[in-house]
């Protein structure tokens, strides 16, 4: 009985940590799932100047900027990137774990398409 309780607790911790890096879980107030299937997840993201995300992970993704914004990304390897977008800019990334911060004077408003592993 005690062994089953310990195993159940360990399994629950593993399941919680598996979702801990999901941006929808870490920053649900900023991300909204627009579509999800076995190949992609489409997200709308909005934040305000000065706001910061918790650390999270994206698989390979494409971002489309709905308006101009400026962000700082702190990557887990210690690098810090500054990215500035104009309305209509598009960016592809192989995926990364990061903390994002709006360092501009306008809201960040993007559509993000995360690419899931899939077989043709």
What are these regions (language model features)?
Residues 1-6:
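Bacterial N-terminal signal peptides that target proteins for export
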Residues 11-18:
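Hydrophobic h-region of N-terminal signal peptides that target proteins for export
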Residues 19-27:
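Cleaved targeting-peptide boundary
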Residues 27-52, 59-63, 113:
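A short glycine-rich, His/Asp/Glu-containing loop-to-beta-strand
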Residues 36-39, 77-95:
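Short acidic-glycine-tyrosine-enriched beta hairpin
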Residues 50-53, 91-101:
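Histidine-centered metal-chelating micro-motifs
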Residues 58-77:
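Glycine- and acidic-residue-biased ligand/ion/polar-headgroup-sensing regions
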Residues 68, 95-118:
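Ligand-binding loop in jelly-roll beta-barrel domains
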């Amino acid at each position: 009985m005690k062994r089953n309780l310990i195993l159940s607790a360990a399994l629950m911790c593993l399941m919680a940590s598996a979702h801990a890096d999901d941006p929808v879980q870490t920053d649900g107030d900023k991300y909204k799932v627009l579509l999800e299937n076995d190949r992609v997840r489409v997200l709308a993201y909005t934040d305000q100047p000065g706001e910061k995300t918790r650390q999270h992970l994206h698989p390979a993704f494409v971002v489309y900027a709905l308006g101009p914004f400026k962000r700082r990304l702190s990557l887990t390897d210690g690098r810090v990137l500054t990215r500035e977008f104009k309305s209509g800019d598009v960016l592809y990334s192989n995926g990364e774990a990061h903390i994002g911060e709006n360092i501009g004077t306008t809201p960040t408003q993007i559509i993000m398409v995360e690419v899931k592993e899939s077989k043709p």
